[in-house]
């Protein structure tokens, strides 16, 4: 006997679909506006979604190409956007790799080893992670100012110092990977030990291949967080050529003149490395899930 949908059920389905469309519009519309502003003539934040006279002026300036005006004058790129983009990718890439390495080894120790004070350390790490980095800006500046006197490449206005500062925020990632490790059956490592594998070999050859999905997630989250981070980077970096893109983009928005078009083009460029890394990591994520299912 065929089931007949009541009107109330249909209305709920329609309401759900309408809510989803509204939610998508709230997400997509601002992104489309940013793209539209980057193709408008002039530096105006308001205007139609589809520019009447599309222009590549802002994109050329963002890519480091001088623009020739109608009167014959030449407008040089105001800021080294591509240098900022490279700085962001370099800092985010190195930081993410180091965070994954440190978080993985630390999580393995907390998940598989027994030592005094383990629970206390875990809880303390989580409590300290709850405090925002903004509260420690003064301390960070004083710390890296002093550190730079002994280790110059870890001092102020260095990417090494910035990367080192980001490594202090791995507590959440340690907890995440630790939880994943605890879902993996210990019998796999015990079987490897019976075959003569050392704890390091069992960790590297058994546990890590099964943990590719969570490692990919941690890498993505770390990369996104570093690319978009502003307070610490703006504190430690003072040279314009050493800025990351998130910090450098603020140079377009000064009280005398808001360069919205140039800012929008730089904003779209800042999304490219995140998108590329996510797509690449997504491939590894799916591969890791499949491999883990077969080996398990």
UniProtKB/Swiss-Prot annotation:
PROSITE patterns reported in the protein's UniProt record: ABC_TM1
Membrane topology category: Multi-pass membrane protein
Location(s), subcellular: Cell inner membrane
Membrane in keyword set: yes
GO cellular component entries: plasma membrane
GO BP annotation list: maltodextrin transmembrane transport; maltose transport
Domain ABC transmembrane type-1: 85-281
Entry keywords, A to Z: Cell inner membrane, Cell membrane, Membrane, Sugar transport, Transmembrane, Transmembrane helix, Transport
Cytoplasmic side: 1-12, 112-123, 176-204, 281-296
InterPro entries: BP-dep_ABC_trans_perm, MetI-like, MetI-like_sf
rRNA-binding among keywords: no
Periplasmic side: 36-88, 144-152, 228-257
Positions of transmembrane segments: 13-35, 89-111, 124-143, 153-175, 205-227, 258-280
GO MF annotation terms: ABC-type maltose transporter activity
Subunit structure: The complex is composed of two ATP-binding proteins (MalK), two transmembrane proteins (MalG and MalF) and a solute-binding protein (MalE).
Family, similarity comment: Belongs to the binding-protein-dependent transport system permease family. MalFG subfamily.
NCBIfam families linked to this entry: PRK10998.1 (NF008231)
Name this protein carries in UniProt: Maltose/maltodextrin transport system permease protein MalG
């Amino acid at each position: 006997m065929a089931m007949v949908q009541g009107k109330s059920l249909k209305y709920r389905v329609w309401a759900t679909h309408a809510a989803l469309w509204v939610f998508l519009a709230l997400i997509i519309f601002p992104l489309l506006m940013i793209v539209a502003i980057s193709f408008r003539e002039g530096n105006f934040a308001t205007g139609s979604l589809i520019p009447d006279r599309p222009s590549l002026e802002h994109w050329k300036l963002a890519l480091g190409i001088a623009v020739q005006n109608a009167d014959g004058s030449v407008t040089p790129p105001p800021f080294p956007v591509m240098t900022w983009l490279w700085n962001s990718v370099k800092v985010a890439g190195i930081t993410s790799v180091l965070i994954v390495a440190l978080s993985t080894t630390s999580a393995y120790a907390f998940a598989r080893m027994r030592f005094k004070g383990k629970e206390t350390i875990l809880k303390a790490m989580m409590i300290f992670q709850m405090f925002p980095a903004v509260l420690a800006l003064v301390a960070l500046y004083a710390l890296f100012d002093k550190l730079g006197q002994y280790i110059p490449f870890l001092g102020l206005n260095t990417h090494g110092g910035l990367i080192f500062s980001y490594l202090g925020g791995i507590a959440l990632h340690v907890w995440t990977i630790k939880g994943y490790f605890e879902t993996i059956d210990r019998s796999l490592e015990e079987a490897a030990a019976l075959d003569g594998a050392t704890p390091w070999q069992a960790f590297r050859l058994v546990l890590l291949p099964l943990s590719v999905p969570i490692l990919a997630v941690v890498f993505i989250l770390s990369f996104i967080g570093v690319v978009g981070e502003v307070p610490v980077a703006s504190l430690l970096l003072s040279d314009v050529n050493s800025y990351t893109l998130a910090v450098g983009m603020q140079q377009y928005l000064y009280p005398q003149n808001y360069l919205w078009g140039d800012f929008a083009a730089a904003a779209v460029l800042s999304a490219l490395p995140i998108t590329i890394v996510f797509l690449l990591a997504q491939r590894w994520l799916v591969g890791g899930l499949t491999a883990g299912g077969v080996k398990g």
